[in-house]
């Protein structure tokens, strides 16, 4: 790595971005979860010797580079983006399952830890470090699949809420297990007290730092109505809360989540115009897509470093232990939550994918840590199984469980829409053929009248359907309003470009249009 200069590093980084963007674009076009596609392609690139890619592979799979990029560069952005757009009201409405699953993370940690000791014969620190690594979940793939199949919004919120908080808990458990656990065990009862104090201190301090910074930056937004500047505020907030918490010995993950939740809810309420909020969200959408694309490609490349020689049996055992622990954690923690569908429990259980955070944490272990190589093999094996096998089977599972049921009346509406579009196309084609081939009016009008009669009948059926399911009509009206607002925005842009109206008037009118678009999105 010493021979690489900054220019070469930039070239390699840009090359990675191009590859990741290309794979992501293809996956999205094919309506497949892009994280899984990136991991698979990254793994293939890592396994196949391609001279063009060798410097790239060497650069990315260097432990310090991977760890820095994932934890310091991308993790604050990904956590901040997710928490920023999570309405606190939604989190409050679903607090019981989210908190229950937070407790379930501890159940999973204990089961994996003790099972790794007894069944895989790992030393105590190694066993519980591995358990902490397996406590973190990565919901990106699952949430993208949820969106594509129309899964209930509440289920998505629970999955995202669980991930935001158990990632923080996983990092805390990892640090305690890796650096303090043996000391606490040697001290006996006193050590248990110290361990509990460290656990509470790290989480509490993270909450305080994130809360204070989130409040301060929210207050700042009251004094500015300048979305580029407020986007910069959000960048500073996410990274400063993470870095400051880490410097103070607190949980940087929890600090970022709390800061972003406050900024995205309280800050948006007291100091952000709808235009500012929309632009901040759009900026972080782009940042998160870029970060996720690079992260999953890097994970795929990194996974190829593992050496499974003579460890296949233990690797499979590790996967089974983690799956059993996840099942126990989900079903035990959610057992007392009333009116929580069992199909949702199955989905949350199988959708608890492991990802980049687990890989980054295990690579951060000191090279002389006892059992480090074994932990690497087991962690990488579970992550690969999780992203590929669970990731590719979650969609069929949703369909089999019926979690992806569409809105009532939607199927009937789509059938009417398809028939109507078919008939409208037929009418246009008849007119075109009549014009080109000089077919007599009497012949064409008879067929056209027949089609128009059928279209009229479809309109009547659609109106009846709208009366039965008014939410379908509301949805169509929302789509129509949104497109009309986009057209209005472009019309103002054209007037400004032709110097028919001043830039000041154009900006004022466009801001009003954006406000209407934001209100429309918030209402639906």
From Swiss-Prot:
InterPro entries in UniProt: Cation/H_exchanger_CPA1, Cation/H_exchanger_TM
A Pfam family the protein falls into: Na_H_Exchanger
GO MF terms held by the record: potassium:proton antiporter activity; sodium:proton antiporter activity
GO biological process, one term: sodium ion import across plasma membrane
TM region positions: 6-26, 33-53, 59-79, 98-118, 126-146, 169-189, 193-213, 242-262, 283-303, 312-332, 374-394
Keywords: Antiport, Cell membrane, Ion transport, Membrane, Sodium, Sodium transport, Transmembrane, Transmembrane helix, Transport
pH effects: Optimum pH is 8.0-9.0 for sodium transport and 8.0 for lithium transport.
Keyword match Metal-binding: no
Gene Ontology cellular component terms for the protein in this record: plasma membrane
Main location group: membrane
Mode of membrane association: Multi-pass membrane protein
Compartment(s) of residence: Cell membrane
Function, in words: Na(+)/H(+) antiporter that extrudes sodium in exchange for external protons. Can also transport lithium.
Annotated family: Belongs to the monovalent cation:proton antiporter 1 (CPA1) transporter (TC 2.A.36) family.
Full protein name: Na(+)/H(+) antiporter NhaG
Gene source species: Bacillus atrophaeus
Gene coding for it: nhaG
């Amino acid at each position: 790595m010493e021979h690489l200069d900054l220019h070469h590093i930039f070239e390699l980084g840009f090359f990675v971005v191009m590859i990741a963007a290309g794979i992501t674009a293809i996956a999205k076009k094919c309506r497949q979860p892009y994280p899984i596609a990136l991991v698979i392609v990254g793994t293939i690139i890592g396994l196949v010797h391609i001279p063009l890619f060798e410097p790239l592979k060497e650069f990315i799979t260097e432990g310090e580079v991977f760890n820095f990029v994932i934890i310091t560069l991308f993790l604050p952005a990904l956590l901040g983006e997710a928490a920023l757009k999570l309405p606190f009201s939604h989190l409050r409405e679903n607090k019981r399952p989210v908190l229950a699953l937070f407790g379930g993370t501890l159940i999973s940690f204990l089961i994996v830890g003790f099972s790794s000791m007894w069944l895989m014969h790992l030393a105590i620190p190694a066993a519980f470090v591995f358990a902490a690594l397996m406590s973190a979940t990565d919901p990106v793939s699952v949430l993208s699949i949820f969106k594509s199949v129309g899964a209930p919004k509440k289920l998505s919120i629970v999955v995202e809420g669980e991930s935001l908080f158990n990632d923080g808990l996983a990092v805390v458990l990892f640090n305690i297990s890796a650096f303090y656990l043996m000391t606490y065990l040697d001290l006996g009862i006193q050590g248990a007290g110290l361990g509990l104090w460290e656990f509470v201190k790290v989480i509490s301090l993270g909450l305080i730092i994130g809360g204070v910074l989130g409040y301060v930056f929210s207050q700042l937004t009251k004094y500015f109505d300048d979305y580029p500047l407020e986007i910069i505020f959000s960048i500073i907030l996410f990274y400063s809360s993470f870095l400051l918490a880490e410097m103070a010995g607190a949980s940087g993950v929890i600090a970022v989540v709390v800061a972003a939740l406050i900024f995205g809810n309280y800050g948006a309420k007291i100091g952000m115009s709808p235009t500012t909020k929309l632009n901040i969200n759009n900026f972080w959408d782009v940042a998160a897509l870029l970060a996720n694309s690079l992260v999953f490609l890097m994970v795929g490349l990194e996974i190829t470093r593992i050496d499974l020689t003579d460890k296949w049996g233990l690797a499979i055992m590790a996967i089974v232990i983690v799956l059993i622990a996840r099942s126990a954690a989900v079903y035990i923690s959610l057992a007392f939550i009333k009116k929580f569908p069992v199909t949702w429990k199955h989905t949350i259980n199988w959708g608890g994918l492991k990802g980049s955070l687990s890989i980054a944490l295990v690579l951060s272990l000191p090279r002389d840590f006892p059992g480090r190589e074994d932990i690497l093999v087991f962690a990488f094996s579970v992550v690969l199984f999780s992203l590929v096998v669970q990731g590719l089977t979650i969609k069929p599972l949703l369909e089999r469980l019926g979690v992806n049921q569409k809105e009532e009346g939607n199927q009937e509406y789509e059938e009417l829409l398809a028939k109507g579009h078919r008939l409208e196309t037929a009418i246009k084609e008849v007119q075109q053929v009549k014009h080109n081939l000089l077919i007599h009016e009497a012949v064409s009008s008879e067929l056209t009248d027949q089609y128009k009669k059928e279209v009229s009948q479809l309109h009547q059926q659609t109106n009846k359907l709208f009366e039965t399911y008014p939410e379908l009509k509301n949805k169509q009206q929302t789509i129509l309003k949104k497109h009309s607002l986009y057209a209005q925005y472009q019309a103002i842009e054209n007037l400004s470009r032709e110097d028919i109206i001043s830039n000041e008037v154009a900006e004022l009118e466009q801001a009003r249009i954006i406000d209407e678009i934001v209100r429309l999105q918030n209402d639906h």
